[in-house]
């Protein structure tokens, strides 16, 4: 059967569909991705990773071009980053996400009709579209074909709010108290007012109703970042890549299936966590040994992975690693990088050299206020930069080095001068990785080649991230305690959920990155009774996430809907043949009865799939 997958090519949206496609092609189905041109290379890489020509031949790419309505919105988000980063409860963060996704009336019309025409040409047995890609969603609705949607964001965005006590997606108070009800009322009023005053939203609502002939989902629903898509007459269900039960938004539509993290069926994703086996073996190792040599291959490698090798060395030295990754959209400022370094230098010293940091540092490829081409390199020269760099480069030391060297490292962190491209980049870190080679307690990386190897490494103890849906749910899947430095929109909800369900801690200063907050929170996560309780809770929720099925469950749900739609087409074809025969032999007297017996609706598909999913 043929399945069409649609999403904006931003990694947060497309990654779960890649995992789902991995499963669908192994079930024998053909998968066609419909997205922007920038995803072409990723599709080619995805094909080559299959190492099987039969599987690779089942992967297809339908290029939707490079128009703003179908291309990666990551750069657009980064251009609004300073306004986007707001504390919990601030509606403007959600509004900026909405504004970045908005396009003009003509751009919206062109994108939706192109998607409709392309899908009708492909004739898929089932369509699955990312709920955060409104232009693509509209094209799917216009086909009249059965379709599904995928949700890679927080649970409250799909929840039905029937009373003021049901938390608003941007709500800071989520305990169903009088104060939370007042906050929800305020946020709902702001949302309604802002939706009514945006001309592009008004034009989009008019297009949906008057030109496209699509049914309304309500005033705020038609304008929402995640509309109530299950209300569309051809929608047969949704797939939520979140763990069942790990939510405070309890009124979820029955058409939506929670499948946990978007993790594939690869056995490497589901075996015993390496750190548990390693801890058990370490207890059995001779007490006289100063280093522990694993009795099993630490990690399978297809090539050198310098990040993993660095973690191997830390583990052999009895050190613990914290992994810091703020996602592909986040850009660090120089002050924030320094705050992190000072915090982890303190942790390193307080632990006697036992705590180290793996730091994924994004580098701005374009100027923050411009989505055009990259700016030419124009580093600023500093008279004492070379001397400061020599201080950093020459400061590597073994565990237990003198306090004098430690003080020099601290001075190097405070004084290091960043290399910048242009003044337009002011405020965003342009550090070169070589500047940190002397800091023994931290390793910087621009790109993680195999994040699974990081998550499963026996040295890893805590993950720090921004609260993105994929980051949060992958940490849950791998039973990793997490610290969430939430930054915008629904990341605050994930931070609140982590703390409420006892699987992590959140920053009390979000979205600011504070040195003392990092030190205090990491100390709580790495040692003591609270840390042990969080580790136990993380293991329990890991089981619940794995039981939900992940990408294999998503693929089976799509397959079930495709099979039902295929049966519908066969029934309709058989009915038309019978109708033609009846017309020839005895007129049309019994055709109406025949049509009523063979009629099939998307609602029946949705109900049937719910039965399949619950078996």
UniProtKB/Swiss-Prot annotation:
InterPro entries: UDP-glycosyltransferase. It is an enzyme of class 2 (transferase). Disruption phenotype: Impairs the production of mannosylerythritol lipids (MELs) and leads the sticking of cells to each other in hydrophobic environment. Does not affect the virulence. Residues 366-387 are annotated as: Disordered. Residues 367-380 have a biased composition (Polar residues). It is a peripheral membrane protein. One of its GO terms (molecular function) is UDP-glycosyltransferase activity. Keywords: Glycosyltransferase, Membrane, Transferase, Vacuole. MELs not only have high potential as eco-friendly biosurfactants due to their excellent surface activity, but also have attracted considerable recent interest because of thei runique properties, including self-assembly, anti-tumor and cell differentiation induction activities, and moisturizing and hair-repairing properties. Pathway: Secondary metabolite biosynthesis. GO terms for cellular component: vacuolar membrane. Its EC number is 2.4.1.-. It is found in: Vacuole membrane. Induction: Expression is induced under conditions of nitrogen starvation. Its main location: membrane. Erythritol-mannosyl-transferase; part of the gene cluster that mediates the biosynthesis of mannosylerythritol lipids (MELs), surface-active substances that enhance the availability of water-insoluble substrates. Mannosylerythritol lipid production is responsible for hemolytic activity of Ustilago maydis. Belongs to the UDP-glycosyltransferase family. This is Erythritol-mannosyl-transferase 1. It comes from Mycosarcoma maydis. The lineage of its organism: Eukaryota, Fungi, Dikarya, Basidiomycota, Ustilaginomycotina. The gene is EMT1.
């Amino acid at each position: 059967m043929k399945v069409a997958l649609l999403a904006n090519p931003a990694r947060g949206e497309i990654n779960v569909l890649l995992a789902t496609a991995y499963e669908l092609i192994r079930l024998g189905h053909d998968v066609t991705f419909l997205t922007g041109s920038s995803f072409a290379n990723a599709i080619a890489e995805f094909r080559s990773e299959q190492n099987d020509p039969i599987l690779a031949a089942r992967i297809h790419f339908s290029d939707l071009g490079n128009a703003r309505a179908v291309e990666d919105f990551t750069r657009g988000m980064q251009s609004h980053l300073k306004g986007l980063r707001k504390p919990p409860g601030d509606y403007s963060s959600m509004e900026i996400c909405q504004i970045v996704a908005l396009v003009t009336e003509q751009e919206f019309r062109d994108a939706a009709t192109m998607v409709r025409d392309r899908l009708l040409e492909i004739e898929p047995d089932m369509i699955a579209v990312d709920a955060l890609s409104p232009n693509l969603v509209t094209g799917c609705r216009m086909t009249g074909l059965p379709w599904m949607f995928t949700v890679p964001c927080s649970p409250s965005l799909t929840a039905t709010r029937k009373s003021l006590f049901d938390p608003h997606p941007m709500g800071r108070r989520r305990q169903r108290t009088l104060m939370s009800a007042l906050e929800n009322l305020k946020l709902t009023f702001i949302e309604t007012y802002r939706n009514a005053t945006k001309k592009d939203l008004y034009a989009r609502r008019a297009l949906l109703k008057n030109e496209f002939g699509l049914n309304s989902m309500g005033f705020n629903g038609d304008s929402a970042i995640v509309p109530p898509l299950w209300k569309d007459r051809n929608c047969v269900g949704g797939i939520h890549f979140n763990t069942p039960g790990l939510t405070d938004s309890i009124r979820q539509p029955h058409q939506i299936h929670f499948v946990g993290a978007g993790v594939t069926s690869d056995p490497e994703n589901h075996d015993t966590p390496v750190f548990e086996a390693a801890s058990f073996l370490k207890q059995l190792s001779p007490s006289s040994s100063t280093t522990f040599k694993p009795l099993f291959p630490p990690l399978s490698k297809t090539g050198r992975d310098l990040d993993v090798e660095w973690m191997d060395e830390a583990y052999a030295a009895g050190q613990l690693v914290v992994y810091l990754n703020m996602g592909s959209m986040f850009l660090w400022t120089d002050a924030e990088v320094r705050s992190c370094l000072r915090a982890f230098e303190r942790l390193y010293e307080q632990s006697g050299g036992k705590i180290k940091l793996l730091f994924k540092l994004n580098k701005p490829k374009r100027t923050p206020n411009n989505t055009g081409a990259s700016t030419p390199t124009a580093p600023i020269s500093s008279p004492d930069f070379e001397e400061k760099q020599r201080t950093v480069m020459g400061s590597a030391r073994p565990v237990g080095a003198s306090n004098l060297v430690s003080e020099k490292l601290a001075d190097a962190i405070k004084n290091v001068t960043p290399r910048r491209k242009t003044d337009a980049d002011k405020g965003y870190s342009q550090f070169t990785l070589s500047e940190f080679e002397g800091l023994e307690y931290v390793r910087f990386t621009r790109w993680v080649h195999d994040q699974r190897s990081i998550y499963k490494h026996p040295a890893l103890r805590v993950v720090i991230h921004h609260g993105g849906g994929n980051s949060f749910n992958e940490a849950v899947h791998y039973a990793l305690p997490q610290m969430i430095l939430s930054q915008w929109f629904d990341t605050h909800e994930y931070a609140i959920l982590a703390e409420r369900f006892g699987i992590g801690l959140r920053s009390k200063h979000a979205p600011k990155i504070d040195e003392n907050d990092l030190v205090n929170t990491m100390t709580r996560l790495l040692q003591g009774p609270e840390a042990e309780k969080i580790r136990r809770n993380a293991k329990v929720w890991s089981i619940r996430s794995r039981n939900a099925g992940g990408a294999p469950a998503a693929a089976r749900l799509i397959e079930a809907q495709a099979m039902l739609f295929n049966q519908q087409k066969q029934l309709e074809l058989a009915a038309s043949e019978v109708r033609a025969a009846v017309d020839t032999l005895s007129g049309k007297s019994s055709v109406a009865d025949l049509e009523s017996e063979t009629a099939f609706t998307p609602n029946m598909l949705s109900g049937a799939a719910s039965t399949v999913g619950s078996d």
